[in-house]
């Protein structure tokens, strides 16, 4: 499990756990900027998930400053902390302590 010391901004005291298998394609899609539909296609290639789940993940990634939204371009972009998170994901995946599909990110 990846721990991220970030306060989620919805005043919910409970931590949120996000699957890395969904986070990674979202972050990768945002490197060059992507609309929601482009992100959806990238995620669906890796793991089937509903639009609602993807919107929830985007919400938490945005609130935690891993990605940002540009309203003029209507695209999501990765932030420096999102690039750092990708690096952490790859290091954890290389260590193979936990199966990739079981890796989660804890947002507090």
Positions of the model-derived regions?
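A short, conserved structural fragment
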Residues: 62-73
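Extended low-polarity, hydrophobic cluster-rich segments
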Residues: 18, 26-27, 57, 84-91
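Short, amphipathic alpha-helical interaction segments positioned at domain boundaries
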Residues: 83-108
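Short amphipathic alpha-helical interaction segments
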Residues: 48-63
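Short acidic, hydrophobic short linear motifs in intrinsically disordered regions
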Residues: 33-44
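Minor-groove-contacting beta-hairpin "wing" of winged helix-turn-helix DNA-binding domains
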Residues: 74-79
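Short helix-to-turn junction characteristic of helix-turn-helix DNA-binding domains
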Residues: 26-34
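Short alpha-helical segments that sit at the start of domains
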Residues: 2-27
């Amino acid at each position: 499990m990846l721990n991220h010391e970030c306060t989620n901004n919805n005043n919910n005291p409970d931590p949120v756990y996000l699957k890395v298998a969904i986070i990674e394609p979202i972050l990768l899609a945002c490197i060059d900027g992507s609309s929601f539909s482009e992100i959806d296609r990238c995620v669906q290639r890796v793991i089937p998930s509903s639009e609602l789940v993807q919107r929830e993940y985007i919400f938490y990634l945005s609130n935690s400053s891993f990605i940002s939204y540009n309203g003029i371009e209507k695209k999501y972009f990765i932030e420096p902390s999102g690039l750092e998170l990708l690096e952490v994901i790859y290091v954890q995946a290389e260590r193979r302590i936990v199966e990739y599909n079981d890796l989660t990110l804890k947002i507090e």
